[in-house]
Regions:
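Flexible, glycine-rich phosphate/dinucleotide-binding loops
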Residues: 26-28, 90, 112
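Catalytic cores of alpha/beta
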Residues: 35-39, 75-79, 83, 87-106
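Alpha-helical membrane segments in multi-pass integral membrane proteins
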Residues: 52, 60, 70-74, 81-84
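Charged helix-capping and loop-helix junction motifs
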Residues: 34-42, 65-71, 118-124
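Conserved anion-binding
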Residues: 1-62, 127-135
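C-terminal helical cap(s) of enzyme catalytic domains, especially alpha/beta-barrels
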Residues: 12, 71-74, 97, 106-135
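Distinct, well-ordered alpha-helical segments
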Residues: 11-13, 32, 65-71, 93-96
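Glycine-rich phosphate-binding active-site loops on the catalytic face of alpha/beta enzymes
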Residues: 1-4, 50-62, 86-87, 97-121
Length: 135
């Protein structure tokens, strides 16, 4: 995921690589996502018209309602969708399975030991993998 740049899209296309840009207005660090659900969905449709067939959406970093955005986006967009940002609990993992995106990413929740408080990064990752395997 990164902001959409036509030059990046063209370069990756020339080298047979997939490009999964962010959609909506993304800013800050950690990143936040702004825009109405309709604007974000339209942004994806506009990018699909340029040949983009996969997206990285920072749904839980949305300034309004991340879960609602994720549900509406995945229902409206016929493309690979990876949900990124703040997937930091078993409840949110369950929600990912319910929404059904192509995938989701997880980062800081593993470093901050959200799943095994006294565990290592590897132990936290293993706890998530074990949990998901049972789904």
């Amino acid at each position: 995921g990164t902001l959409y740049y036509e030059s990046v899209h063209n370069y990756l296309k020339e080298h047979n690589m997939t490009y999964s840009p962010f959609v909506g207005k993304v800013s800050g660090s950690p990143s936040i996502l702004e825009g109405t659900n309709e604007e974000i969905i339209q942004n994806a449709k506009d990018l699909m018209a340029k040949g983009i067939d996969a997206f990285d959406i920072l749904a839980y970093r949305h300034v309004v309602d991340g879960e609602k955005l994720a549900r509406e986006f995945c229902a409206a967009i016929d493309a690979k969708v990876a949900i990124a940002g703040s997937i930091s609990s078993y409840e949110r993992i369950d929600t990912m399975f319910d929404i059904g995106p192509w995938g989701f990413t997880m980062g800081s929740a593993l470093f901050t030991k959200n799943f095994v408080p006294d565990g290592s990064f590897k132990e936290n990752l293993q706890a998530v993998a074990d949990y998901m395997e049972k789904k």
